[in-house]
Amino acid sequence: MSIKNIFSKKKKYASVPSEQASQDVPEGIMTKCPQCKKIMLTKELDKNLRVCMNCGRHLQMNAKQRIDSLVDEGTFEEFNGHLISENPLGFPGYEEKLEKDREKTSLNEAIVTGQGEIEGKRAVIAVMDATFRMGSMGSVVGEKITLAIEKAKADKVPFIIFTASGGARMQEGILSLMQMAKTSSALKLFSEDQGLIISVMTNPTTGGVSASFASLGDYNFAEPGALIGFAGRRIIEQTIREDLPEDFQTAEFLLKHGQLDAVIHRAEMKETLGRILALHSTGGEREWLEN
């Protein structure tokens, strides 16, 4: 071996596993719980309302799964599903990302709105879907929520919204932030007309969504373990220079500090909503007592 070879650095290469090898769980067939790491058959998990059979973790639901689990069979009618986002600010790559999400989710936007019955009681229902642009709120999401509220007001039925969002959609800038005021104003008018508002916050409900319509219900509920907050935990800790409680920004923390009315298990959600709708319907108090 020459002197030159002794002092020369040997090249080291990192081995990158193939896509097939890197998959711990077969896609679509099995699902791993992000909390306890238990691997479950996806179809069994879906039957259990996507609640982990081992630790009770509430896994993410898409809008269709949520509606199917809540609304009486054959009663849901979607409206304004044709509305789609454009690119008002000319944000690079935004149209391509929207199109990719449309293909992946079969949705036009991050929310589905419609009307249906829960335990025989009519309501207008809005369900956000975090699989589309992380459920972010752009101008179309705000418009669909506002139109749904106005529909509930015109029909004199309750308005129920399930939130799941990373906050305002940055690609739409100020137009996205305007939806906070727009949706809040619509809820205010609906409330002044004696309309019933039920908000259910699911994981995650953050940013501008948590700071606007998500927190404006007559009843504010959440699912167990849901992340709910405005700014991120790290940002808050760096700002106040203090450590935050372990359960900070969880549904249970908010309930303990009076910011929620209840934390409701997914398996009990339909029955709970049905009882509240019955209570607020004509003769509802008598019906509630009889049940």
Swiss-Prot record:
Swiss-Prot/TrEMBL keywords: ATP-binding, Cytoplasm, Fatty acid biosynthesis, Fatty acid metabolism, Lipid biosynthesis, Lipid metabolism, Metal-binding, Nucleotide-binding, Transferase, Zinc, Zinc-finger
Principal place of residence: cytoplasm
Enzyme class: transferase
Binding positions for Zn(2+) per the UniProt entry: C33, C36, C52, C55
E.C. designation(s): 2.1.3.15
Cofactor(s) demanded: Zn(2+)
Protein name: Acetyl-coenzyme A carboxylase carboxyl transferase subunit beta
Organism per entry: Bacillus pumilus (strain SAFR-032)
Lineage start: Bacteria, Bacillati, Bacillota, Bacilli, Bacillales
